[in-house]
A protein has these predicted regions:
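Short, extreme N-terminal segment that most often corresponds to the first beta-strand
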Residues: 1-37, 219-223
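Short, intrinsically disordered low-complexity segments
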Residues: 37-132
């Protein structure tokens, strides 16, 4: 899909986002406990998203909240990155709780560097699926929808987390993830911010609430 000057497509080398099925931006901000909320422009917001993704000192400090997009509200930033082990448990529980409040909540991580994909699908307080390509042992639930179809097309009849990690099929799958990227799943389940036309309303910037971290992330040595 196309875009407009006022609402550019959201891109980042490592893109993490939460999406909640509601048009009430204020309630999402409240439910997340976000602080120091302020208006921004789309251009500045999108630029900030990529800057924060590269921020090694405070990667989890800032998020960008979109206006409603096709019935969903997105909150973007590494704070919601499932592959960052210091975040995984926290954001999983957070997404589950948000789904209990709003009906549906989802998390996604997409790497333009082809070094990882992740998603979490929650509905009505239940985790239906969590997949983190770098940590298959952390998978929850059953593949469904486009994930299931692409696995079947690749000849994987079970779950990818059950594959022999030293086997040929697992290695071939991991080379491209069978084109089953987070953006692919998001396109079917909710909103893919790399292609969706965003609302012309104004996004917000906010500080994310701190939480106790058991250890710093070491994924790819970036943070």
């Amino acid at each position: 899909m196309g875009t407009t000057d006022s609402a550019p497509l959201i891109r980042a080398c490592w893109l993490s986002w939460l999406v909640v099925e509601t048009v009430d931006q204020t309630e999402v901000v409240k439910a997340l406990g976000l602080m120091d909320v302020r208006d921004t422009t789309w251009a500045d917001g999108v630029e900030l998203i990529d800057e924060v993704a590269h921020n090694e000192k405070k990667p989890f400090s800032t998020v960008v909240i979109t206006p409603p997009v096709q019935g969903w509200t997105l909150v973007v930033g590494p704070y919601f990155g499932l592959p960052y082990l210091s975040q995984t448990t926290h954001v999983t529980d957070l997404c589950r709780k948000l789904s209990a409040l709003f009906g549906k909540a989802q998390l996604f991580f997409h790497s333009e560097q082809n070094d990882g994909e992740a998603w979490l699908i929650a509905e009505r307080g239940r985790i239906l699926r969590r997949w983190i390509s770098e940590y298959p042992e952390l998978a929850l639930g059953e593949p469904s929808g486009v994930e299931r179809r692409l696995l079947d097309a690749y000849g994987i009849t079970g779950k990818p987390e059950d594959l022999d990690p030293d086997g040929d099929l697992a290695g071939e799958w991991a080379a491209t993830w069978g084109d089953c990227w987070a953006t692919t799943v998001a396109e079917e389940c909710s909103i893919n911010p790399t292609t969706a036309v965003m609302s012309e309303g104004r996004p917000l910037i906010a500080d994310a609430p701190p939480f106790e971290q058991s250890h710093r992330p070491s994924r790819r040595g970036r943070l």
